[in-house]
Curated annotation (Swiss-Prot):
Cofactor binding, note field: Binds 2 Zn(2+) or Co(2+) ions per subunit.
Protein's UniProt name: Succinyl-diaminopimelate desuccinylase
Sites where the protein binds Zn(2+) 1: H78, D111, E174
Gene3D superfamilies attached to this UniProt entry: Zn peptidases
HAMAP family referenced in this protein's UniProt entry, alphabetically: DapE
Cofactor names: Zn(2+); Co(2+)
Catalytic residue positions: D80, E145
Alphabetical UniProt keywords: Amino-acid biosynthesis, Cobalt, Diaminopimelate biosynthesis, Hydrolase, Lysine biosynthesis, Metal-binding, Zinc
Self-association state and partner proteins as the record states: Homodimer.
InterPro entries with a match to the protein in the record: Bact_exopeptidase_dim_dom, DapE_proteobac, Peptidase_M20, Peptidase_M20_dimer, Peptidase_M20A
Entry function: Catalyzes the hydrolysis of N-succinyl-L,L-diaminopimelic acid (SDAP), forming succinate and LL-2,6-diaminopimelate (DAP), an intermediate involved in the bacterial biosynthesis of lysine and meso-diaminopimelic acid, an essential component of bacterial cell walls.
Length: 391
């Protein structure tokens, strides 16, 4: 059995529901230690939500001359998975990795345990061929990416920053491809800014509206205006910033009572053309103009990041072309990832992994034919980066 497939099956068999790593990181650490990696477990979070993080690093070989330098490339990812959903609806048990019709089924097969396995095997192959590389290699893994993401990658990044650790390049193994492995990579992500808006009125009998103030009616014109705002026009790398309402809560449950308040949850997905502060200011101005009695609580989930074409992007694009013949598409679409935390301490961050059509679904799977190319691409990226150091 191919090494990556075998390791992927070992990881899929572990029911690592957030925040339980279920031993996945130990399996990986045991593969990395013989290669010269120092492996450190960093735990965080309250007693009832204990998160396991792994930081593993192999130092570069000493440089031969002043003209040469060393760089640190980090593979980042998560060992945690989302719940399987109804087990009886699966083709196989979600934690019994099963091959059928050319596909490997199991929770985490695409998101993202196969990427983790491919990371490890790619590094094994690369270091076997180039044990004296000037490229330092790291692994940053967490069991808190699919959950609140408060005690995972962000905590490791804070610890590394406090130590003065410099990361030059980072590849996050998120499933970014669409139809074939390598057809799309993410060279950035939009920021996410959420808020809960509470608009106050006066509760009363629905037959006597003159004795009450309906907060839903009061806020409706403001919402209509906000829906029509052009927050920005995006740019060459990002689509325009979007504003979307996710939830509206109001009422007592009775059909004859005007509610006393309405609570509205909304979210911005914003480009580098806007800032959290500018969006907050502009939205508050609309609410003030409509003379609403309101409270607003903001939560910044992450700021946008962008890695423009350069050393890392070029190394990945070239590796994909070498392995698959595909000309990959650079994209910043989709949701957030832990790349937003890593970008704070690393100037070049990209995300690349297998097709994502089945992630978080019943019968999550990856095409077996995609597994070896994924491993080879990761290895070729290391080769490209290493070659650049000795050129």
């Amino acid at each position: 059995m191919p090494k990556t497939l075998h390791l992927a099956e070992q990881l899929i068999a572990r029911p690592s529901l957030t925040p339980d790593d279920a031993g996945c990181q130990q399996i990986i650490a045991e593969r990395l230690a013989p290669l010269g990696f120092s492996c450190e477990t960093i735990t965080s979070g309250p007693a009832d939500f204990r998160v396991t993080n792994l930081w593993a690093k192999r130092a570069a070989a000493p440089v031969k001359s002043a003209q040469h330098t060393t760089k640190l490339v980090v593979f980042a990812g998560h060992t945690d998975i989302v719940p399987s959903g109804p087990v009886q609806q699966w083709r196989c048990h979600p934690f019994t990795p099963t091959q059928f019709d050319g596909k490997l089924y199991g929770r985490g097969a695409a998101d993202m345990k196969t990427s983790l396995a491919a990371f490890v095997v790619a590094v094994e192959e690369f270091l076997t061929a180039q044990p004296d590389t000037a490229l330092a290699i790291g692994f940053l893994l967490t069991s808190d990416e699919e959950g609140p993401a408060l005690d995972g990658t962000v905590k490791v990044c804070e610890a590394l920053q406090a130590r003065g650790e410099r990361i030059d390049y980072c590849i996050v193994g998120e499933p970014t491809s669409l139809e074939r492995t390598g057809d799309m990579i993410k060279n950035g992500r939009r920021g996410t800014l959420s808020a809960r808006l509470t608009v106050k009125g006066v509760q009363g009998h629905i037959a006597y509206p003159h004795l009450a103030k309906n907060p839903i009616h009061l806020v409706a014109p403001a919402l209509a205006e906000l829906v029509g705002v052009e927050w920005d026009r995006g740019n060459a790398f990002f689509p325009p910033t979007s504003w979307q309402i996710s939830n509206i809560h109001s009422g007592t449950g009775a059909s004859n009572v005007i509610p006393g308040a309405v609570v509205i949850d909304f979210n911005f997905r914003f480009s580098t053309e806007s800032t959290p502060e500018s969006l907050q200011t502009r939205l508050a101005a609309v609410l003030e103009r409509h003379e609403l009695d309101y409270e607003l609580a903001w939560t910044l989930g992450g700021t946008p990041f962008l890695t423009e074409p350069g050393t890392l992007v070029d190394a990945v694009v070239d590796a994909i072309k070498q392995e698959t013949g595909l000309t990959t598409v650079l994209s910043t679409t989709g949701g957030t990832s832990d790349g937003r935390f890593i970008a704070r301490i690393c100037p070049q961050v990209i995300e690349f992994g297998p097709p994502n059509a089945s992630i978080h679904k019943i019968d999550e799977h990856i095409n077996v034919a995609d597994i070896e190319p994924l491993t080879n691409i990761y290895r070729r990226v290391l080769e490209n980066l290493s070659a650049g150091l000795s050129a």
